[in-house]
């Protein structure tokens, strides 16, 4: 059959490893015979063979096996006189302790920033310098590894609806501060259906894996986007899942992690209360002073925000009741929980105030959606 279809009777057999981990090695080779490895990465969290979250180094690998993988990658690149940045990919079967060659990608991978984070080496720069004929100004002993890095792929899709693509105009793009974000979009960008759904890569770096996970979760929580839905909540669920944190995940492990599928989580009480406060301030600003009015006024005119108002969340049976109290706003949720913010203020897309005496300031982007309002925190 192979002879008839391809003119070659050779058949290439691959080992079937249903619960494998995807481990890859970054290499650099110049035109003067030098080849180095820059450590390994783990890319085992995948959906339909598409990577979701990557990290470096690959955690929980036996050190002897890691050394063998790294050495094999260097020998492979040396044997073909490889020149450039490249990635040697393996499948590792924890059950047998064996690993198998998968492929070599002769380019920079999407996930190369995690290697840059732990080595401090600019891979794009060295790819260009090697192409110009320069000699690698590094030895293998110069390559040192510092801490742990995680990359989260941010895509315009709805995981709760079978990863349906999201399209539209981005009305708010407020990424978190203090982390690396590789992206080519901004507020006003139009997300269409003609291209890949990935809009950005979020990269964090910490002294250890647990710290990197915490940083990634905090960055996702601080990321505010409007106009187009993203997979942020899904990626957060992966990062906080016990299987990922204990390194029990594998390339086909998503059904094990979410056996009944994944549903968009319900906002917690604090976020719900703050969202309604932001909308309340947006719809009924406090400044009703006659001295700030350009027209005539009378004593019976409305004097600022109403003392109380009710708001219904989508599909809710009971309203969220908002009331002005001296120097504060209080939101009473349908379940009776009370969220009170002192000195609340909405300035542009930022809501600020104090809760239990602790100051807060966060993005609160409000947009009209037909007969509804959307608040993006």
Q: Each predicted region: which residue ranges?
A:
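Protein kinase-like catalytic core scaffold
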Residues: 23, 34-37, 98-103, 180, ...
């Amino acid at each position: 059959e192979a002879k008839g279809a391809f003119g070659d009777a050779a058949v290439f057999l691959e080992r079937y490893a249903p619960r494998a981990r995807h481990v890859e090695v970054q290499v650099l080779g110049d035109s003067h015979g030098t080849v180095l490895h820059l450590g390994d990465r783990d890319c085992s969290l995948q959906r339909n063979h598409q990577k979701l979250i990557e990290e470096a180094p690959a955690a929980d690998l036996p050190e002897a096996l890691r050394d063998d993988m790294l050495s094999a990658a260097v020998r492979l690149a040396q044997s073909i006189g490889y020149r450039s940045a490249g990635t040697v990919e393996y499948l590792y079967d924890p059950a047998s302790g064996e690993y198998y060659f998968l492929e070599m990608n002769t380019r920079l991978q999407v996930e190369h920033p995690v290697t840059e984070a732990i080595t401090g080496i600019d891979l794009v720069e060295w790819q260009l310098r090697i192409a110009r004929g320069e000699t690698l100004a590094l030895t293998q002993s110069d390559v040192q590894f510092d801490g742990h890095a995680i990359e989260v792929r941010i895509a315009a899709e709805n995981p709760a609806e079978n990863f349906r693509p999201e399209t539209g105009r981005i009305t708010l793009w407020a990424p978190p501060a203090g982390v690396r974000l590789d992206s080519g979009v901004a507020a006003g960008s139009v997300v269409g259906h003609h291209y890949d759904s990935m809009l950005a890569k979020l990269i964090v770096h910490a002294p250890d894996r647990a710290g990197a996970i915490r940083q990634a979760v905090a960055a996702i929580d601080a990321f505010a986007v409007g106009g187009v839905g993203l997979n942020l909540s899904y990626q957060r669920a992966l990062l906080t899942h016990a299987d990922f944190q204990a390194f029990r995940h594998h390339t086909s492990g998503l059904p094990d992690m979410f056996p009944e599928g994944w549903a968009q989580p319900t906002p917690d009480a604090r976020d719900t209360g703050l969202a309604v406060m932001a909308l309340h301030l947006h719809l009924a600003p406090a400044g009703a002073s006659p001295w700030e009015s350009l027209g005539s006024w009378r004593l019976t005119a409305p004097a600022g925000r109403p003392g109380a108002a009710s708001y219904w969340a989508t599909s809710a049976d009971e309203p969220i009741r908002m009331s002005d109290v001296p120097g504060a706003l209080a939101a009473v949720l349908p379940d009776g929980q009370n969220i009170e913010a002192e000195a609340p203020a909405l300035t542009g897309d930022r809501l600020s105030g104090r809760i239990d005496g602790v100051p807060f300031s966060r993005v609160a982007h409000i947009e009209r959606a037909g007969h509804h309002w959307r608040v993006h925190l």
